[in-house]
């Protein structure tokens, strides 16, 4: 529910918020009857705390006491509360909104309830006095900048093991930057518990090694680390975040955890030295621009995973040395521009589970000579095989109904074309060759 979503809906007096809602923006219900008719200082909509009606309350409360049954806390709810010292959430709270407790310099202690799932972006940013952090064992996500600028926060242990519970599946970008953790790198790598959250400034990492207990890599953890060439123990990481190795231009090889399910968006973006990637046996998807511009990558075999299903937009765009790709039998989704400008790719074989070849998917794959489309393909998007100059034969299966504009534009070697019996439309310039 976005910021000011129902602002000044003055007749609104009842709302049921479903359990699927994970975010309520600032002022979402202000100036409604829900707000104006509330007689207490805290304004609740269904089970969400959506406002502190009396801002003077911030000047008197040192310990927060929310009612049992509260499910979520709205964005910015206690922003810069001047004397709040401790927060202990009831077990019912699942979600703490963006910057909900940020900027509270007096806050020393935060204790999550048993069912907290998400700390959203900046939830405790710049709480400079925060020292005691007790997170629960069902927490799944710590958002970007969640504890940014908490300058006294250290790696206090949870059960003698880690400040981060084992249940956590994602840590956002710079969640612990400018905390005490940032000043205590281990071999130039910065950890929050058993998670990698960054690297030391001006570090020359080279062939680096993660500690044996490592479980995950946060978003942007090695962002533009131009000296990293390899990373031992990366295969221990069950979670690797968005843009984790963004523009690590010297990174050459990576060995991924066999149980890794997703290569997130921009994970290896423009890692131009990367030439070998192990495909996890449980891999399900590759995100947007995950390997964009990995110009030294030569081969990919997704058939090593029996559950591999989707390739995101721009995922392998500009992998100019990529020669072979094997998709396996369960691919269903192929992204726009996903293999565009893969100029050395020689063969594409799509399984019967693929229903569409989207726009620009294999455009400018000038070395492509073999194309086999599965029997499930119903559409070929605009410029899908644009300027694939090596193609000499194209067979469209009977399932194909539409061929988009310029789909095979300037395929200058094309000599044989077989059209399926279900074809309904061929777009402008589809097979044009000037």
Predicted regions located by residue number:
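Structural signature of tandem-repeat unit edges
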Residues: 9-23, 32-46, 55-72, 81-95, ...
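Consensus positions within tandem repeat domains that build extended binding/scaffold surfaces
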Residues: 2-7, 26-28, 75-77, 97-100, ...
């Amino acid at each position: 529910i976005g910021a000011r979503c129902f602002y000044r809906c003055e007749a609104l007096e009842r709302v049921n918020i479903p359990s699927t809602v994970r975010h309520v923006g600032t002022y979402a219900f202000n100036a409604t009857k829900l707000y104006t008719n509330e007689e207490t200082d805290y304004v609740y909509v269904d089970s969400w705390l959506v406002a502190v009606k009396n801002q003077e309350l911030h000047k008197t409360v040192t310990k927060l006491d929310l009612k049992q049954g509260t499910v979520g806390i709205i964005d910015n709810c206690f922003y810069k509360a001047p004397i709040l010292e401790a927060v202990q959430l009831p077990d019912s709270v699942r979600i703490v909104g963006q910057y909900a407790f940020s900027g509270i310099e007096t806050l020393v202690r935060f204790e999550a309830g048993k069912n907290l799932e998400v700390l959203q972006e900046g939830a405790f940013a710049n709480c400079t006095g925060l020292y005691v952090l007790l997170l629960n064992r069902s927490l799944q996500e710590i958002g970007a900048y969640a504890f940014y600028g908490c300058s006294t926060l250290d790696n206090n242990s949870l059960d003698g093991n880690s400040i981060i519970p084992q249940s956590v599946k994602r840590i956002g970008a710079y969640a612990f930057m400018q905390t005490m953790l940032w000043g205590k790198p281990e071999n130039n790598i910065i950890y929050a518990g058993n998670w990698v959250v960054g690297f030391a400034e001006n570090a020359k990492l080279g062939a680096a090694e993660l500690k044996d207990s490592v479980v995950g890599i946060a978003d942007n953890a090695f962002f533009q680390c131009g000296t990293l060439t390899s990373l031992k123990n990366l295969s221990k990481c069950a979670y690797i975040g968005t843009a984790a190795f963004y523009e690590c231009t010297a990174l050459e090889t990576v060995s991924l955890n066999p149980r890794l399910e997703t290569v997130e968006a921009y994970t290896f973006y423009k890692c131009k030295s990367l030439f070998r990637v192990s495909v996890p046996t449980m891999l399900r998807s590759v995100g947007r621009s995950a390997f964009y511009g990995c110009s030294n990558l030569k081969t990919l075999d997704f058939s090593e995973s029996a559950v591999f299903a989707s390739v995101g937009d721009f995922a392998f765009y500009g992998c100019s040395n990529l020669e072979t790709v094997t998709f396996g039998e369960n691919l269903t989704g192929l992204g726009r521009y996903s293999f565009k400008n893969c100029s050395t790719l020689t063969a594409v074989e799509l399984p019967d589970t693929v229903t569409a070849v989207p726009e620009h998917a294999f455009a400018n794959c000038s070395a492509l000579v073999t194309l086999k489309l599965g029997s499930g393909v119903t559409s070929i998007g605009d410029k899908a095989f644009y300027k694939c100059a090596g193609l000499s034969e194209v067979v469209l299966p009977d399932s194909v109904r539409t061929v988009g504009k310029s789909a095979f534009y300037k395929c200058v070697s094309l000599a044989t074309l077989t059209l399926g019996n279900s074809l309904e439309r061929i777009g402008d310039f589809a097979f044009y060759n000037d």
